Regions:
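Radical SAM [4Fe-4S] cluster-binding motif and immediate context
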Residues: 1-149, 154-156, 165, 169
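A generic structural signal for short hydrophobic patches within well-formed alpha-helices
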Residues: 121, 192-193
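Catalytic palm subdomain of template-directed nucleic-acid polymerases
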Residues: 160
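C-terminal structural cap/anchor segments
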Residues: 163-164, 177
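Active-site PLP-lysine loop of aminotransferase-like
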Residues: 182
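Radical SAM enzyme core and accessory elements
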Residues: 193-271
Length: 271
């Protein structure tokens, strides 16, 4: 029996970037492992044969190998399916790839913006992503016909009440259709975990308590409990019904896509 609206497909694992909080970086050490495109297409075609019109490409970063992704998109396009995935902001600078991704049916990409503060990006070893570029990245991706979802972190050492207020305003003004937040978490095995252990800043070592909505790190500006409070403060502001309706139902780009509007409205309600 067909359950749901899409199924997952994977083309590759890993990411060439080495963000110090990331488990993918910890596992794959900056490497990207790709599957044979024929095998990936076999899986996508099977998803379609089961009656699904959409799939979720669960790769960690679809621009890890641009040429590979370009060829995959060319193969996907004739199937006339819709799909979702996540990638790094470099896709906005690759016009050919961005167009191919959009033309092949992709309608939403999730980006790990992490922070709008440059010093924070240095701290997490993600200097290749410049917060000054975020608005232009979103504009280019939207222009291609793809909605932008985002993932951002709360509780980096540079975070203050003022920087988090600025983050709220950034999300409100930037056309992000589905903003998601996570507390900065020292997952065992990551560079972040090693550093925080050495500094004695982890307030709870029970990994069963590690979740996006609860901080276990004390920062220069907040205790772990205060970071958790800030997390929920940001959420209450950005996930008020007024904010959800503004970026979904009353989003001008959604006028021609009523079912997509309902999908994103539902996603926001779940978040």
């Amino acid at each position: 029996k067909k359950i749901g609206h899409f199924l997952p497909v994977q083309a590759g694992r890993g990411c060439p970037n080495t963000c110090k909080f990331c488990t993918i970086s910890c596992l794959f050490k900056g490497k990207y492992l790709r599957r044979d495109i024929d095998e990936v297409m076999r899986d996508i075609e099977h998803v379609k044969s089961l009656g699904f019109k959409e799939f979720l490409l669960v790769d960690d970063n679809i621009v890890s190998d641009p040429e590979y992704m370009l060829e995959l998109c060319r193969r996907i396009k004739p199937l006339k399916m819709r799909w979702m995935s996540q990638c790094a902001i470099q896709i906005a600078d690759n016009e050919e790839l961005l167009k191919a991704v959009a033309d092949s049916g992709c309608y939403v990409l999730s980006f790990g913006f992490e922070s709008i503060v440059k010093e924070a990006m240095k701290e997490i070893n993600k200097t290749w992503a410049d917060p000054d570029d975020y608005i232009e990245v979103i504009r280019k991706v939207n222009k291609a016909g793809i909605e932008v979802a985002s993932e951002m972190i709360i509780g980096i050492d540079t975070d203050t009440r003022q920087s988090l207020d600025a983050t709220i305003e950034f999300v409100k003004k930037s056309n992000i259709i589905a903003p998601k937040f996570y507390c900065y978490t020292p997952i065992p095995g990551t560079v972040l975990n090693k550093e925080m252990e050495e500094q004695g800043r982890i307030s709870d070592h029970n990994i069963l308590e590690y979740r996006p909505s609860k901080s276990v790190l004390n920062t220069p500006h907040f205790t772990a409990e205060e970071v958790t409070f800030e997390y929920w403060r940001v959420y209450e502001e950005l996930y008020s019904m007024k904010s959800i309706l503004k970026r979904t139902v009353f989003n001008k780009r959604m006028i021609k896509h009523p079912f997509r509007t309902l999908f994103f409205f539902g996603i926001n309600m779940v978040y």
